[in-house]
UniProtKB/Swiss-Prot annotation:
GO terms for molecular function: DNA binding; DNA-directed RNA polymerase activity; magnesium ion binding; zinc ion binding. DNA-dependent RNA polymerase catalyzes the transcription of DNA into RNA using the four ribonucleoside triphosphates as substrates. Keywords: DNA-directed RNA polymerase, Magnesium, Metal-binding, Nucleotidyltransferase, Transcription, Transferase, Zinc. SUPFAM superfamilies: beta and beta-prime subunits of DNA dependent RNA-polymerase. This is DNA-directed RNA polymerase subunit beta'. InterPro entries: DNA-dir_RpoC_beta_prime, DNA-dir_RpoC_beta_prime_bact, RNA_pol_asu, RNA_pol_N, RNA_pol_Rpb1_1, RNA_pol_Rpb1_3, RNA_pol_Rpb1_3_sf, RNA_pol_Rpb1_4. Zn(2+) 1 binds at residues 70, 72, 85, 88. Binds 1 Mg(2+) ion per subunit. Its EC number is 2.7.7.6.
Length: 1412
């Protein structure tokens, strides 16, 4: 009976494992797995379809092909379970053992495993200290390797050709041993003594950098072998395991052909060659034949393991490369990504979606037929429970016949059972939401209009998938966490996601506009009901201005009850009627204005913060209903007459054409270069297009009407097109400009701008040429979109992979580190206020009042909307907040450092997978980012033309710390710093605006003066960059030779001549000298820089126009030379997605700038051929020098004092330099600002903390600078958390700890270098990751989400984190219990046998224990 029960006991996998280890298998291990040796290459008998004995599908080895039946049919049925048939040798058992029983092949000659040979760096090469080329020559029988030199002069490990070998053999006879093939390699590997090698390498860590690097690499591999207990000779195999046959099936097709897995072909080839080799060895065949066969065997084994890794790939009959074992697991269609990370799911369906305007937010319409299929098991169980069907079979029949009772049961089953809807591509967590199904007729799923924004769905044929959560736990999670009405905020930025759009916005906007002199204007009503009556009877129009008495409910501070308060309000009919839908506690002022899309969003946000989730969802639903109704009633439509072409358009275009003609004239007479002409023309047309757009909008947006008193007044226009754009329902000013203004400039496919614009608009119609020019851009747009989607998806994948294991694991790590946040100000505009930046963060230290120094906000408090009101009132301009970057939690993050969970509005919960959320928030808008990189012109050139800054507000002038200026001969202040900024602060000392001022600008203000708004603070020439002297003196030219280093240019029109510095590449002679100017004082001595003995030397860069004469007297601030900006290389501004990817991959930019390595004084040493030697001397006299190419623009001059990390050579910054010189905080600031710049340009809002989370993951590894007493190796990169753990251990033992330097890894690198080999292997470079892991005998602790998904456990995030914690706690308790029981037993044993213990102590013969 017990056997029978065991039989029905379900096959349960081993639940309890905490880690997975990977290693190399020894030959004994492989044999122990095996159920028999595969000796023949035959597969199955094509007539009987039975497997051949000893072949690749042998039933004796792998198990029976029919359940509980042996091959010859002697034993059938369950009663013979476990019997081995004496006739055919097959065990009688289930056929599914053919999925896990392995076989083996005994190789007649050893074969090297190709992964350890060819996967770079070659592990075999590292262990043997031989080059890959040499090992290959030995393995493939082209050369001998010396295994035992004996008493000869030969060296072990040395390589010899066949001729050498013959010569040496004749000379020395059998004194030495040299071998070919894998045997030789295996022998060498077996003779390596790991301990001795490790000692030797550890002692040999000095000398050249290359040697240290090589030794540390070898040491790492040796230590790995030693630690994991793996013997190096196992990298060469004597036994080959054979995959279970059901994993490489052979399926008979009709017509006598077979479909087979490629592995069978590869195995057959190995077996054939192996058998042939064995026979040749038996026959003692000539060496050369045997050798060839061994080589072929090695090649066959190579292709089986990884086809195409070395040499040509083996091909099948149809010339396509065979799919080897390695190909099975790697790539998108490999085991990891196809089957383990992305599975097909049962209980799911998909259909087209249609709009369901009558649904509530938490509902979706589910077609009846689909529901019937999806909920089948629930219906069956219900039918059985009600006694309508006795068996499942009967229930099935009942359902198929479709009796009315089935539909009733379906209604019952579906009640309160949420289903999940998903729309591909699922770019963020709102791409899957749960809804309560409502049964509908038809075959399309109905979707609530408000969730379309989150799904990015529209109803032009989109499809969605439905999934049914089965277990009670799954239903509960779907209900509490995923229900659409619980997800009303975007996790990326905390804005509401259920904002109405399009028709709804238009309806609400129209109804809340006011029209002058509408019917019923000036009436006063007693309540809203009366207004509704008047509207219904046609006595008032919906846009009429009226007064009405409204009741507002305000919350009482003490009791928390709502108290009514009624007052007379000036409003319009539409707004008064809308007031009905406001929840209690939301003031009428929120809708007493024209509701545009932004306003509606703000309304929903305010409602969420003030009235809570439930009220907000109800409000959103009501807004939706009203909006649709009002839009229908408004009857807004557009006609061609709504597109008003501005009257001034003709004049503006004529003026522009005149300007362009002038420039053409200048170009012909040689005043401007071709490039300047193009830029200016493009600029003129760009400006004209904007102006036409401006006058058009001005004309569209206003209309003249008579008011009640018969006067003509302006009012905002009721033009349909204008209303659509103004409300945010559809279209934008730019699009209206194309309809009624002018289309403007078009781009060529390569992104450069065509200088002849399209002056027509769509209202007037385009001519053939204009239409043709338009097609360029339109087609490129479509092609770009396709590329963009793929690139964006790949970026998201990399981001998710690098952050997937970051989960909130504790409440507070107790640090007070953080970053100081202030408002983001650029060019005098506040781009992002302090409030927006710190909302939802936790304060790191107390926030003090700037004047009274009292505590405004204590440390460790989350800044919500109310707290921020207090902060703003106190005029605080800098707050230090906690950040994921400085969180001290080892594995994971703490809630305080993360702050508010943006998708829910409260402090983040433990178990929230913040890493994945960050990755999704950054990746999701990726498709909106432009791929097109702006070339200078059009968009970018207009920014460059700024030539002055003016104050935007009244205030007090201050300069930043790096601002430096001199007074020139005319008494003007000239800026000589590169990063100077003017700061304007208000009377509280709060910074209001900040303006960057370029080198060479003239200041019109002094420090500490008061200015009025509109004052011009500074101006400069935007088209040239000056070079200015700080000191007075007489100019003395050096190396300025006409025709050699400079050329004289004479202007044909004006006749003036200027000197231009020639590019050294074009010079005939004097290629290495640099034209420069020194200054002499009155006595004729060189002027020195104060405080140094360096003379003032100012170089003229390439292409600069020299503005002074030799011997001229100069005052400080005088311009020595100008560099035309157009002459500078116009660097492409990498924009959009590629820029984001570049930042997260931490790539060093090309033409990168140089930062000062230390604080000190600049000097120039001896120059080399094309480079300048730039030196920095610190106060202690230490010198750092760097060679800078001459064509680079050096931003410093001799004798200037620079600070560590300051820019000294022009160019984009390298993130690695920023980290090294300025630290983590500066690096984070740089990456966050740069990424935000790209997204801001597209109008995408992302919270800073998401980017910080990614930066934390990029910094998660450190490089060991000094290993101390730890087991680390110098220069090794290790996980930060594990290093800190090791150091804690060392401290506890009183040993020396390891010191480290921070390392910044790009996201791809960081994903591949995680401690989890399962996660890394499923990401990219599977072979390399697994090879490395196998040699190191790595354990995967299954910490991240991905590894757990792959091994099929609950993920350690969300509810899964609690489950894992509970499981661990229970295991620990069980362990403790087991130990205590064992102790108890031991004590009892001891009490039973007192004599034995005592005697044993004395040391006599112990007495035999008493008989029990």
């Amino acid at each position: 009976m017990k056997g029978l029960l065991d039989l029905f006991k379900q096959f349960t996998p081993d639940e309890h494992f905490d880690a997975i280890k990977i290693g190399l298998a020894s030959p004994e291990k492989i044999r122990s797995w095996s159920f028999g040796e595969v000796k023949k290459p035959e597969t199955i008998n094509y007539r009987t379809f039975k497997p051949e004995r000893d072949g690749l599908f042998c039933a004796k080895i792998f198990g029976p092909i029919k359940d509980y039946e042996c091959l010859c049919g002697k034993y059938k049925r369950l009663k013979h379970r476990g019997v081995i048939c004496e006739k055919c040798g097959v065990e009688v058992t289930q056929t599914k053992v053919r999925r896990d029983r392995m076989g083996h092949i005994d190789l007649a000659a050893p074969c090297a495993h190709i992964w350890f040979l060819k996967s770079l760096p070659s592990r075999l090469g590292l262990v043997l200290d031989m080059t890959l080329r040499d090992i290959e020559r030995v393995l493939y029988f082209e050369a001998y390797v010396v295994v035992d030199p004996g008493m000869t002069e030969l060296k072990k490990f040395s390589i010899m050709t066949e001729d050498d070998y013959d010569a040496k053999k004749q000379q020395h006879g059998d004194e030495f041993v040299a071998l070919m093939g894998a045997e030789g390699i295996q022998k060498l590997l077996a003779e390596i003594d790991l301990d001795v090698e490790i000692e030797r390498l550890r002692g040999d860590m000095t000398g050249s950098e290359l040697k240290v690097k090589k030794n540390s690499r070898r040491l790492k591999v040796m230590e790995a072998f030693k630690k994991s207990g793996i013997k190096p000779q196992w990298m060469v195999m004597n036994v080959l395991p054979v995959l279970p046959p059901d994993l490489r099936p052979l399926v008979p097709l009709d017509g006598g052909r077979f479909a087979t897995s490629d592995l069978n072909d590869l195995y057959r080839r190995v077996i054939n060659r192996n058998n042939r080799l064995a026979r040749l060895l038996e026959l003692k065949a000539p060496e050369i034949i045997v050798r060839n066969e061994k080589r072929m065997l090695q090649e066959a084994v190579d292709s089986l393991l990884d086809n195409g890794r070395r040499g040509k790939a083996m091909t099948g009959a149809n010339k396509r490369a065979l799919k080897s074992l390695a190909d099975m697991i790697k790539g998108k269609s490999g085991r990891f990504r196809q089957n383990l990370l992305g599975k097909r799911v049962d209980y799911s369906g998909r259909s087209v979606i249609v709009v369901g305007p009558t649904l509530k937010l938490h509902q979706c319409g589910l077609p009846k037929l689909m529901a019937l299929e999806l909920f089948k098991p629930f219906i069956f169980s219900r039918l059985e429970a009600m006694g309508i069907a006795t068996t499942i079979k009967a229930a099935k029949k009942e359902v198929e016949s479709g009796t009315p009772v089935v539909w009733d049961i379906l209604e019952e089953v579906i009640k309160e059972h949420p289903v999940m809807l998903n729309r591909a591509p699922t770019l963020h967590r709102l791409g899957i939401q749960a809804f309560e199904p409502v049964l509908i007729e038809g075959k399309a799923i109905q979707l609530h209009p408000l969730v379309c924004a989150a799904f990015n769905a529209d109803f032009d044929g989109d499809q969605m998938a439905v999934h049914v959560p089965l277990s009670i736990e799954a239903q509960m999670e779907a209900r509490t966490l995923m229900l659409a009405s619980n997800n009303v905020l975007f996790p990326a930025n905390g804005e509401p996601s259920i904002v109405p759009s399009q028709d709804v916005v238009l309806g609400l906007y129209y109804a809340t506009r006011d029209r002058i002199n509408a019917k019923g204007e000036g009436l006063i009503f007693s309540d809203v009901v009366e207004v509704q009556r008047a509207l219904d009877n046609g006595q008032v129009e919906i846009t009429a201005k009226i007064a009405v008495r409204l009741t507002e409910w305000t919350k009482d501070k003490e009791s928390g009850e709502f108290v009514p308060e009624s007052k007379l309000v000036d409003t319009t009919v539409g707004r008064a009627l809308l007031s009905e839908i406001l929840p209690k506690g939301l003031p009428f002022a929120n809708i007493n204005k024209a509701l545009k899309k932004k306003e509606i969003s703000r309304l929903i946000n305010t409602s969420f913060r003030k009235c809570g989730l439930k009220e907000t969802v109800v409000l959103a639903d009501k807004l939706l209903q009203s909006g649709f109704r009002l839009a229908t009633r408004a009857g807004i439509s557009i006609s061609i007459d709504d597109m008003l072409v501005p009257k001034q358009k003709h004049d503006l275009i004529e003026r522009a054409e005149k300007e362009v003609k002038e420039i053409e004239q200048q170009y012909v007479s040689g005043l401007v270069t071709a490039g300047e002409r193009y830029n200016k023309v493009v600029d003129i047309w760009g400006k004209t297009g904007d102006e036409v757009g401006k006058v058009m909008m001005a004309q569209l947006s206003k209309q003249k009407v008579e008011d009640r008193h018969g006067k003509l007044v302006d009012q905002e226009s009721f033009n349909s097109i204008y209303m659509m754009a103004d409300s945010g329902a559809r279209g934008s000013a730019a699009q209206i400009r194309q309809l009624a203004g002018m289309r403007g400039l078009m781009a060529k496919p390569d992104g450069s701008i065509i200088e002849t614009p399209i002056t027509a608009n769509f209202r007037e119609g385009l001519n053939v040429l204009q239409y043709f020019i338009s097609t360029h851009g339109a087609r490129k747009g479509l092609a770009d979109t396709a590329l963009k989607t793929a690139n964006s998806g790949y970026l998201t994948r990399r981001l998710v992979d690098v952050t997937q294991d970051l989960v909130v694991t504790e409440d507070d790590c107790g640090t007070d580190a953080g970053i100081a946040m202030r408002a983001l100000v650029e060019g005098g505009e506040v781009i992002e206020s302090l409030r927006d930046r710190i909302l939802g963060r936790v304060t790191a230290i107390e926030v003090l009042h700037p004047e009274t120094q009292q505590v405004v906000v204590p440390a460790g408090l989350m800044l919500d909307e109310d707290t921020l009101d207090i902060v703003e009132a106190a005029a605080v301009d800098e707050v230090k907040v906690r950040t994921p970057l400085t969180c001290h939690t080892r594995f994971g993050l703490c809630a305080k450092c993360y702050g508010r969970d943006l998708g829910r509005g409260g402090l983040v919960n433990a178990g929230e997978a913040v890493g994945v959320i960050a990755a999704q928030s950054i990746g999701e808008p990726g498709t909106q980012l432009t791929m097109r990189t702006f070339h200078i012109g059009g968009a970018a050139s207009r920014a460059a033309v700024a030539s002055s800054v003016e104050a935007k507000s009244d205030g007090h002038i201050g300069f930043n710390a790096t601002m430096r200026y001199v007074t020139n001969g005319k008494g003007e202040l000239v800026v000589i710093s590169r990063s100077g900024e003017i700061i304007i602060s208000d009377q509280h000392g709060r910074e209001r605006e900040r303006h960057k001022v370029p080198y060479g600008a003239t200041l019109n203000i002094k420090a500490d003066q008061q200015v009025k708004a509109g004052t011009v603070l500074a101006n400069w020439d935007p088209l040239t960059r000056p070079i200015i002297t700080e000191f007075a003196g007489k100019a003395k030219f050096e190396n300025v030779e006409e025709g050699v280093t400079v050329a004289k240019q004479v202007d044909e029109v004006t006749g003036l001549s200027t000197l231009v510095v020639i590019d050294p590449k074009r010079r005939g002679a004097a290629k290495v000298v640099r034209p420069q100017v020194k200054l002499l004082d009155a006595a004729g001595n060189e002027v020195k820089i104060p405080g140094t003995d360096h003379s003032v030397t100012i170089g003229f860069p390439i292409g600069s126009l020299v503005q002074i004469r030799d011997g001229q007297d100069l005052a400080p601030g005088e311009v020595l030379a100008r560099i035309p900006v157009e002459g500078q290389k116009t660097r492409d501004i990498t924009g959009g997605l590629p820029r984001v990817a570049e930042l997260f991959e931490a790539r060093t930019p090309k033409d990168k700038g140089t930062l000062a390595e230390m604080t000190g004084t600049v000097s120039f040493g001896k120059e080399t051929k094309g480079k300048v030697r730039l030196q920095i001397t610190d106060p202690d006299g230490k010198v750092y020098e760097e060679l800078v190419p001459k064509e680079k623009n050096i931003l410093v001059h001799e004798g200037q004092v620079v600070n560590k990390g300051e820019s000294i050579v022009d160019g984009p910054a390298d993130p690695q330099d920023i980290l090294r010189l300025l630290g983590i905080e500066e690096l984070a600031r740089y990456i966050v600002d740069e990424v935000q710049d790209v997204y801001r340009l597209q109008g995408v809002k992302i919270n800073d903390k998401h980017i910080e989370v990614i930066v934390r993951q990029m910094l998660r590894r450190v490089q060991i600078v000094n290993p101390g007493d730890t087991h680390y190796i110098l220069g090794e990169q290790v996980e930060r958390a594990s290093m800190l753990d090791t150091n804690d251990k060392m401290r506890a033992e009183g040993k020396m700890i390891a010191t480290h330097a921070d390392v910044l890894l790009g996201i791809t690198k960081a994903s591949l270098s995680t401690d989890s080999f399962i996660s890394a292997a499923s990401f990219q470079e599977t072979t390399r990751v697994l090879t490395e892991a196998a040699i190191m005998g790595k354990r995967d602790e299954l910490r991240g989400l991905k590894e757990n998904v792959i091994v099929g456990r609950l993920i350690p995030a969300g509810t899964g984190l609690a489950f894992h914690r509970a499981r661990k706690a229970k295991e620990e308790m069980d362990d403790a219990e087991r130990r205590s029981i064992a102790l108890q037993e031991a004590e009892e044993q001891a009490l039973l046998t007192p004599a034995t213990t005592a005697e044993a102590v004395v040391g006599e013969e112990p007495a035999p224990p008493p008989a029990q």
